[in-house]
């Protein structure tokens, strides 16, 4: 009986070419596994394609709800954004994919897991750190780093290899954008984006989102409610998290929300440029933040922001299955206990405009915030506070005056 390998399979040219290569190079039985994180119609026809390419079996695992609730929401609650722009769409998906690959490898008794990530990108790190953390005994095969036996460098090479092995599938020989899509976002790299001086060709590029200048001339109001930091209703209708994200994608896409052009610092040291469409995610993050500012005290909000930035780095670097990620998430979960309430905002030509928020746990006190005198706050109380709060500044200034006077003698 042949040993088995589980291949992370997308149905694209790279992973299709890997199937006969694994059989030819290692004499493995190839079990393909496609993890459905919300790719949509990209999954159509995969079973036939995998088997025509030589796989003995294809698993299509729907993890959309798990991805939404256990991977997306911890990052939303933390406000995790990498380098102030990137909402971690690809980064959050890789650990759930790694988890399912390991589960299927265990079920099939496979000795190895194979992925098609290149040797220059972040995904190789994310996949392999996840697999190492969950199954240190399982071998990982990364063809693009095995240049002694993987000789295909270009798309044309892969097409020729497939054809030579009897795989005649309708792959496009032309170069196109490199895209990664899931429920949360779609990323675009390649072509004109490789030169950061070029403006993206948005008419050809965008998939989910209308360019803001072409969005409707009339704004649209949206209302959301949250319980303990988790979205529960959208425009009065109760939904699962995944359903809310799906609907927000439609609304945000219609109004040109969530297009980001970023030059980011990859884990491997190089800079890369990409355009990300995250319409629903951008709205959800903004709505959650809008409610938090009403509820969390200053020091908690500040500390949470710092840890949110740290979590973004941890997730981006593929360190989901670590004590550090668990510890950050535990802190964030405590802060979310009272993040309950309603937010309202208007979507208009790429903008999310606040239109009110309320919460039974709001720390906003109108009598305190107003400029009139109230029972809870006496303007005279500020005298003592400013004296003490400014004491270090005053002491330093006095010392500087003393030193200057002595120097002038």
Residue ranges and their predicted role:
Residues 2-409:
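Nucleotide-activated chemistry modules centered on ATP-dependent adenylation/adenylyltransferase
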């Amino acid at each position: 009986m042949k040993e088995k390998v589980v291949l992370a399979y997308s149905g694209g040219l790279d992973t299709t070419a890997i199937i006969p290569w694994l059989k030819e190079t290692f004499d493995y039985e190839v079990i393909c596994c496609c993890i459905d994180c919300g790719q949509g119609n990209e999954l159509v026809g995969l079973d036939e394609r995998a088997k025509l390419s030589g796989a003995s079996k294809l698993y299509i695992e729907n993890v959309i709800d798990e991805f939404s609730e256990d991977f997306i929401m911890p990052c939303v609650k933390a406000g995790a954004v990498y380098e102030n722009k990137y909402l971690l769409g690809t980064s959050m998906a890789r650990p759930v994919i790694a988890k399912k690959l390991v589960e299927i490898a265990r079920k099939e008794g496979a000795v190895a897991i194979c992925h098609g990530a290149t040797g220059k990108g972040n995904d190789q790190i994310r996949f392999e750190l996840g697999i190492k953390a969950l199954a240190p005994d399982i071998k990982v095969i990364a063809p693009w780093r095995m240049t002694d036996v993987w000789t295909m460098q270009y798309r044309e090479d892969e097409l020729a290899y497939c054809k030579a092995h009897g795989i005649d599938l309708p792959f496009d020989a032309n170069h196109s954008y490199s895209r990664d899509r899931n429920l949360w976002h779609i990323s675009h790299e390649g072509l004109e984006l490789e030169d950061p001086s070029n403006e993206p060709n948005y008419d050809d590029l965008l998939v989910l989102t209308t360019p803001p200048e072409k969005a409707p001339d009339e704004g649209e109001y949206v209302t959301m409610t949250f319980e303990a930091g988790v979205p529960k209703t959208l425009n009065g209708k109760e939904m699962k998290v995944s359903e809310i994200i799906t609907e927000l994608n439609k609304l945000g896409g219609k109004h040109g929300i969530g297009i980001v052009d970023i030059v980011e610092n990859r884990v491997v040291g190089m800079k890369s440029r990409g355009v990300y469409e995250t319409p629903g995610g951008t709205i959800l993050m903004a709505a959650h933040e809008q409610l938090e500012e009403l509820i969390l005290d200053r020091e908690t909000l500040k500390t949470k922001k710092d840890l949110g930035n740290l979590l973004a780095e941890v997730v981006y670097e593929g360190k989901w299955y670590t004590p550090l990620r668990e510890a950050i998430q535990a802190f964030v979960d405590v802060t979310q206990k009272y993040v309950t309430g309603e937010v309202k905002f208007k979507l208009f030509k790429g903008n999310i405009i606040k239109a009110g928020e309320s919460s039974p746990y709001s720390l906003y006190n109108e009598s305190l915030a107003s400029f009139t005198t109230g029972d809870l706050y006496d303007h005279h109380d500020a005298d003592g506070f400013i004296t003490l709060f400014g004491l270090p500044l005053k002491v330093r200034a006095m010392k500087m005056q003393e030193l200057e006077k002595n120097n002038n003698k």
